[in-house]
């Protein structure tokens, strides 16, 4: 990683925000381990991201084509089909490259939770949103959490969680 970690506790951060960032990072584990060195021992890390399998988890809303930007789940197509569809809809090369990069970096709830354990963070709190709070401003929809029972249904929860919010701290191990 390019940025050198602070030398002493006073130079470290109380709060680090990763909102809609982690799903764009290829080496997530290495990145999170490096972030630990910037966090005060009493600090918290916020990680917010769209679950990969949710209807627009591939960020296809950035497409110019109405078909691609409004069609849910197309990012789950095999790479060759997805790439061909984007080209057929005349998406720009830069957009296609960005969408394929997001597809390569995809982040499921299970992946993040595995990384949290591997990187020795503890979960202070988490929320799985059925209707992302940002959708109030964007689409005039009322935010709502996924029902609690659904939080426990691994893999299936990814299809219904439009935003995952985690507050983490350093494990005392």
Regions found by a protein language model. Give the residues of each.
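Short loop segments at secondary-structure junctions
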Residues: 171-173
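A conserved beta-strand element that flanks and buttresses the S-adenosyl-L-methionine
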Residues: 17
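S-adenosyl-L-methionine-dependent methyltransferase catalytic module, highlighting the catalytic core
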Residues: 29-34, 44-169
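Local beta-strand N-terminus motif with an aromatic residue
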Residues: 12-13
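Helix-to-beta-strand junctions that scaffold the AdoMet/dcAdoMet cofactor pocket
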Residues: 25-26, 39-41
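Conserved SAM-binding strand-loop segment of SAM-dependent methyltransferases
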Residues: 1-7
């Amino acid at each position: 990683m390019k940025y050198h970690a602070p030398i002493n506790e006073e130079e470290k951060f109380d709060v680090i925000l990763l909102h809609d960032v982690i799903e764009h990072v290829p080496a997530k584990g290495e990145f999170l381990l490096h972030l630990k060195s910037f966090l005060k021992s009493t600090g918290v890390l916020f990680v917010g991201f769209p679950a990969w399998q949710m209807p627009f988890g591939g960020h296809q809303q950035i497409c110019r084509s109405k078909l691609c930007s409004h069609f849910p789940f197309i990012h789950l197509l095999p790479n060759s089909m997805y790439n061909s569809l984007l080209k057929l809809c005349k998406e720009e090369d830069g957009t296609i490259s960005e969408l394929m990069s997001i597809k390569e970096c995809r982040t499921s709830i299970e992946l993040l939770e595995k990384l949290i354990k591997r990187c020795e963070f503890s979960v202070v709190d988490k929320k799985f949103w059925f209707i992302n709070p940002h959708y109030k401003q964007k689409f005039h929809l009322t935010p709502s959490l996924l029902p609690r029972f659904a939080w426990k249904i691994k893999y299936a929860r990814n299809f219904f969680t439009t935003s995952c919010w985690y507050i983490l701290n350093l494990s005392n191990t």
